[in-house]
Each structure stands twice: as structure tokens, then as C-alpha cells.
């Protein structure tokens, strides 16, 4: 979901091209851990509210999509972007004033 009044002309095609370009770049995914005290100092690293991370968590898992993005993340990840397969937008829709939704599928790599 996105906070947009309208989708710009050519939105779906442009997003598909950008996503597929990054997928085809075969960027490696690296996992590391940082002490919580270090991680919370980097606003780009933790993009959610720090208070949502339980106080008992002393090490923050960091996922680095090398050359593209690096952030705290506890989810499951592929080893490289090429494993994702081709990205295709199947539908764009309005979910109310200022809110848009993009539906997509991933085709086998």
C-alpha cells in the first residue's frame, strides 16, 4: 500500500522495470548482528518505532541487500535478488482517498 493521491502515468511499467532491474542485478544478501545500543543510533537502520522492539532483544539482526538497502529485519530472505524471479504488477487499485494498493506476482527464476 502507498500513500498517493493518484498513480502517475506509466507507474506500473516504471516500477516493474525498476524492480526487475534490481532483481537481475543479482545483489547478494548479507546478514549480520549489531548490539541494540549501536543499532538504535542509526535512524536509517531501524525504520520502525524502536519501542516496538522488545527490551529483551539485545542483538538486532541486520539485512544488507548489498548496494541497495540495509536495515534491521527479522524476516526470511533469499541469498541474492536473482532468486526472486520476474516481478509483474497485476493490478493497481484505490483503497480510499490518498491510499493506493499494488498487487503483484513473482514468476519463477
List the predicted regions and their residue ranges.
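Active-/binding-site microenvironments in catalytic and ligand-binding cores
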Residues: 1-109
Amino acid at each position: 500500500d502507498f500513500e498517493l493521491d493518484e498513480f502517475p502515468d506509466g507507474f506500473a511499467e516504471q516500477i516493474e522495470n525498476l524492480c526487475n532491474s534490481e532483481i537481475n542485478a543479482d545483489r547478494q544478501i548479507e546478514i549480520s548482528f549489531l548490539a541494540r545500543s549501536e543499532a538504535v543510533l542509526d535512524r536509517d537502520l531501524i525504520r520502525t518505532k524502536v519501542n516496538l522492539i522488545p527490551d529483551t532483544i539485545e542483538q538486532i539482526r541486520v539485512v544488507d541487500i548489498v548496494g541497495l538497502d540495509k536495515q534491521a529485519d527479522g524476516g526470511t530472505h533469499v541469498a541474492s535478488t536473482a532468486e526472486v524471479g520476474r516481478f509483474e504488477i497485476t493490478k493497481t487499485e484505490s483503497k480510499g482517498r490518498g491510499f493506493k494498493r499494488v498487487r503483484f506476482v513473482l514468476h519463477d527464476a
